[in-house]
């Protein structure tokens, strides 16, 4: 390969990966939850024209900062107002749901939007223990790992007609029949999830945007240990990254102060809508608050388009990511749209990479 400068290397690396969006439907002190959900539809329409490959919706419960609690419903709404991007869950928290119900909802989505739906599954409840109990209506909410494995295996047995003849579920069909389950992705923030995704032959998405785990370890472990399956012939690893970009570094840093304050308050058990940069500037931070913010900033890419480009490209190279999925939590919806516009322009997105390259089939 010909020698290239730092900027040229960044562009060269980027051409090897796709760029996608994870939308949490952020709630702010100026944006109530209903408006946040409508902002998601607005951003999805906008992103679909910019050339992003995927648009995923999250499942979180009882979090005042996030309106995204029902990703399957939002997927249908987003898919209906877009035409290019793959739309999926990032993810459905499987311990909260009956596997058959998850399958049927996503088969319906696949039937309505064939070839455009992704089923991302998470192992955590996406909430606190009390809310988890309210969701599941059972007393034991501590054995989530084993529960996930049981539910995931049940889902696979339904899809493959793998239940023994004498099993009561052998007579149950996930409807609509004749419609395949969308490509499965396992989400995680540690090497355990990466190893599990590799063993079952699923796609893998690593949540670096909230994990302290070095991303290179799980991302490379997944790729090295991947086993082909009926779902996927080759590994596909997505790196989830939190990024805030503006025309100038100073403006991006100002926008990021909303996330700084949210992180400082969350560490104290104080949850609320995302505050404005002005409120964040007036907050009386303690030395411990500032230490926590500094630590969190290490995994948050903030800056001008060029700076964010370099940061993302470096992570994509070190983790060998096939795709980078960006989440941007800022106070102003227009600023969030502009951030993705800047990313699309900086990375020279023209149109989404061909869906057949990423559907796992």
Question: Language-model segments: what does each one mean?
Answer:
Residues 7-85, 356-360:
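N-terminal beta1-alpha1-beta2 module of alpha/beta enzyme domains
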Residues 23-38, 92-100, 178-188, 296-304:
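Active-site mouth loops of central-metabolism enzymes
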